[in-house]
Regions:
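Glycine-rich, acidic/polar active-site loops that bind/position phosphate-bearing ligands
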Residues: 1-340
Length: 340
């Protein structure tokens, strides 16, 4: 009996890459193998030399089609099997392997906004705004919550696919939600987040709504959408000195701007110093401070071990870039401090 393999890849659209996918029918017992596509239609090639390679890197059950069908996450390669310039996973893998002994873990909080056409769900039809922020975060009841059907269906799909999804919640703005992926390693966390994003788009299709990962989906006195990224190493999970070393390393000379440059498009619109953010061009860290660039949870200070939360990444970030940057910066500093 044949089965369907949905090949998923990240395209070359700038400033924010899009997800693409197509279906291949495979014979029973056959493993997903390399495939090709027209890179000139995905901003990854010119028309006169348009072939690009899909290299499978992770296969999971397909919760949309069910049965023996699968989702196949792929890296994009050139026809000589080198990493394509849009392939950010290859550099991520190199850093992950270099610091594997430190056992980096990530938990990524992916925020997003559901739209009906040009209107965020929960905003009045015909224009105008809902009541001010306050009752929507982790809210319940039809006056506060919209889109839960999509959110629950997506959660179930991620679980059925075997992804390391760890929770969901309604966010501060109407129509805005969050799901969390992790704990998982440097590359695994990003792999699982990209598949979870694809599933979210796919589930939303069936409900006739669209998903926005825009950093500031509604201008004005409304929260932006981020991808707060929690990080730890073995040393951080065992002692507080390593927590401080990691937090300090992210503010070292040149590091704040290097990181925000890789944290998604529209960073200046979201990181204003308002709405639970720190200014994009300043670095700070503090205990229980959601107005800092990096937050140390209060329980971490009490326990004298745990993790840090980088609050700067946008919802539209490339998680391969985010986990690579944090792993490289923090693990290098911890290695130099002999805190491994």
């Amino acid at each position: 009996m044949s089965y369907k393999a949905e090949y998923i890849w990240i395209d070359g659209t700038k400033p924010t890459a899009l997800l693409r996918s197509k279906t291949k029918i495979l014979a029973d017992g056959a493993e997903p193998s390399i495939w090709g596509f027209d890179g000139s239609s995905t901003n990854q090639a010119e028309g006169h030399a348009s072939d690009r390679v899909l290299q499978p890197v992770l296969t999971v059950p397909d919760p949309i089609r069910g049965g023996d069908n699968v989702l196949v996450l792929c890296e994009v390669q050139n026809i000589d099997f080198t990493a394509h310039e849009s392939n950010t996973r290859a550099a991520n893998v190199e850093v992950a392997e270099r610091f594997a002994a430190q056992e980096p873990w990530f938990g990524i909080e992916q925020e997003y906004t559901l739209f009906d056409g040009e209107r965020p769900l929960g905003f009045p039809e015909g224009g105008g705004f809902p009541g001010p922020q306050g009752p929507y975060y982790c809210g319940v009841g039809a006056s506060n919550i919209v889109g839960r059907e999509v959110v629950e269906k997506h959660l179930d799909a991620c679980l059925e696919a075997g992804l390391k999804i760890s929770g969901i919640n309604a966010e501060v703005m109407p129509g805005q939600w969050e799901f969390q992926v992790g704990p998982a390693g440097t590359t695994e966390a990003a792999d699982h987040l990209w598949i979870a994003r694809w599933l979210l788009h796919r589930v939303a299709e069936d409900y006739g709504v669209t998903v926005s990962f825009g950093a500031k989906p509604v201008k004005g006195d409304w929260n932006g959408a981020g991808a707060h990224t929690n990080f730890s190493t073995k040393a951080m999970r065992e002692g507080y000195d390593a927590i401080i070393t990691a937090a300090e390393s992210l503010g070292a000379e040149g590091k704040p701007l290097e990181h925000v440059a890789g944290y998604g498009d529209g960073i200046q619109d979201r990181l204003t110093g308002l709405h639970e953010t720190a200014p994009w061009n300043e670095y700070s860290y503090g205990v229980s401070n959601r107005g800092a660039s990096v937050r140390i949870p209060w329980q971490v200070e009490v326990d004298q071990k745990g993790y840090i939360e980088d609050r700067r990444p946008n919802a539209n970030c490339d998680p391969y870039n985010v986990t690579r940057l944090i792993t490289d910066t923090c693990c290098t500093a911890l290695e130099k401090a002999d805190q491994v």
